[in-house]
Amino acid sequence: MRTTNVWLVVIVWVTVGWSSCTGRFVVEKNNLRVTSPESIRGVYECALGNFGVPQYGGSMSGAVVYPKTNQKACKNFDDFEISFRSRVAGLPTFVLVDRGDCYFTLKAWNAQRAGAATILVADNRPEQLITMDAPEDETSDADYLQNITIPSALVSRSLGSAIKTAIAHGDPVHISLDWREALPHPNDRVAYELWTNSNDECGSKCDAQIRFLKRFKGAAQILEKGGYTRFTPHYITWYCPEAFLASRQCKTQCINGGRYCAPDPEQDFSRGYNGKDVIIQNLRQACFFRVTNESGKPWLWWDYVTDFAIRCPMKEEKYNKKCADQVIQSLGVDVKKIDKCIGDIDANAENPVLKEEQVAQVGKGSRGDVTILPTIVINNRQYRGKLQRSAVLKALCSGFRETTEPPICLTEDIETNECLQNNGGCWEDKTTNITACRDTFRGRVCQCPIVQGVKFLGDGYTHCEASGALRCGINNGGCWKQTQMGKTYSACRDDHSKGCKCPPGFIGDGLKECKDVNECEEKTACQCRDCKCKNTWGSYECSCSGSLLYIREHDICINRDARGDFSWGVIWIIIMGLGAAALGAYTVYKYRIRTYMDSEIRAIMAQYMPLDNNPNTQLSSQLEL
């Protein structure tokens, strides 16, 4: 009876989960290009499998093989003495198998053990492509799921039939799988979500999730601290139907009046923790992220969830608020802020945090509904593949716009540096070890670099030239430069933003060669009648016969004595000119002073006696008469 009740509640939750979502499940698709034979050449769609390791950001070409026996790949190919291992220098093997009779994951595992590089599953129904997923039920041999590393894809029945027909006719079928556009990569920052759960008693899936959190934490924190990513954790919740609100099942699995629920960890209501404990811890983790994100340290969430899993496991009966608060305090976060965010879980009211989580579950645009735990969403596209550090990191790295990837995406275990072989076919200055090859996650680009503040200009493939004021400091701006007899000449000029020009005294292209100009033979200098010319490297020497002196500015020889006499004559003329000017100034000064004094004396005398030439005196005499 207890088991019946448990399954009844599980069925109700699944039904409610689907009915409450107005969105839909989106199949993540990828491009598959058939390059031969001519009859089926073209680009087709295929659906990414939700297991294995898709080569996000990369591509793979191979030859298709359709086995003569074990065509559904439900058995070990070794039993049929079939091997798909590539020959030396041969193309990788893409094995095509039929859908049906066993799990998709088992088909992939058998193909991988036989040496296949990729498995293509041909649909057996004329339907839209679906997502191949791992089995939900746990079996005794389910450990192989974690060991599947080859990519997988589902192709339509029509394409599968066309490939089989071509192989039957003896035509080699070559296919290229391209994952470079599987995820959008619009800019230099990747937004991704992790839909997770605090439950650690759900078997192998919970164990795999905790292992992933611990192993991925370092990379996630590097990306977040560097501002390369914008991470958000999410938690799936359901609500209890109104008809079951008074039931024991809803009361032990839900909070806030049945609005937010989680399944019982052990699927046994009579022992251990219940769904209510899980939903509360999920809410606490969501609030922890909110508080730390507001303080500018969102990466602390990774420390909290991994520390909580270690210090507060259900098996040790520490999965509670007391243990959680200790972890929160150890990370320097205010517990009161977390509690305030959590709010009243017993109130018959909506919780803003969990309400947003329910809304976020519904797919929008190109993203489908979130129905599987765990789920990773990268740039609004659901990740398909293994929950493994390197696989997820590759997917994240493929979400960056090319040339904006962080250093962690360019390590050897993540991608192949294509600049190491023949410099990627790009321009290179071996003298200064400057190259235009820039390694990217998807391959490489040929782009003229910026070195020590100096920008190089060019096509990046055959030519790059330093530009700007500081360009001569880097390999002399790529221009000619030579030193002889203690003298150094350069064709690079700091006052020119680009280009090379041979200095005066040289002629050439300025890049590879500048030849000395013989001014004596070219008759461009030292050509006066008494001049004697001698060419030097980069210049010339000019002398005069006898006691003559060479004036370089005027290209002339003059007499040293004549030059001295001339100089003294100029000096005497200047002295005499200054003397004449002083004498003239003194004469004018004396005349003006004398005139001024005479007028002053006459004015004084006119006050005491009449003067003959005083007009005021004559006017006074006329008035008296």
UniProtKB/Swiss-Prot annotation:
* Domain spans labelled PA: 55-167
- Which family is this protein grouped under? Belongs to the VSR (BP-80) family.
Q: Which Pfam family is one of those matched by this entry?
A: PA
**Name of this chain's protein:** Vacuolar-sorting receptor 2
- The entry annotates sugar attachment on 147, 293, 433
Which ranges does the record list as Cytoplasmic topological domains? 589-625
Molecular-function GO terms, alphabetical: calcium ion binding
Judging by the UniProt lineage, the source's domain of life is Eukaryota
Q: Which InterPro entries match?
A: EGF-like_Ca-bd_dom (IPR001881), EGF_Ca-bd_CS (IPR018097), PA_dom_sf (IPR046450), PA_domain (IPR003137), VSR_TRX (IPR056858)
Kindly list the cysteine pairs connected by disulfide bridges.
419-437, 426-446, 448-464, 472-492, 479-500, 502-514, 544-557
* Gene expressing this chain: VSR2
Q: Which tissues is this protein detected in according to the database?
A: Expressed only in flowers.
Localization per Swiss-Prot or TrEMBL: Membrane; Golgi apparatus membrane; Cytoplasmic vesicle, Clathrin-coated vesicle membrane; Prevacuolar compartment membrane
- Return the GO cellular component terms, semicolon-separated: clathrin-coated vesicle membrane; Golgi membrane
GO biological process annotation, one example: protein transport
Give me the segments passing through the membrane.
Answer: 568-588
Reproduce the free-text note on domains from the UniProt record: The tyrosine-based internalization signal may be involved in trafficking at the TGN.
Q: How does it sit in the membrane?
A: Single-pass type I membrane protein
Q: Where is this motif: Tyrosine-based internalization motif?
A: 608-611
Q: Where is the signal peptide?
A: 1-19
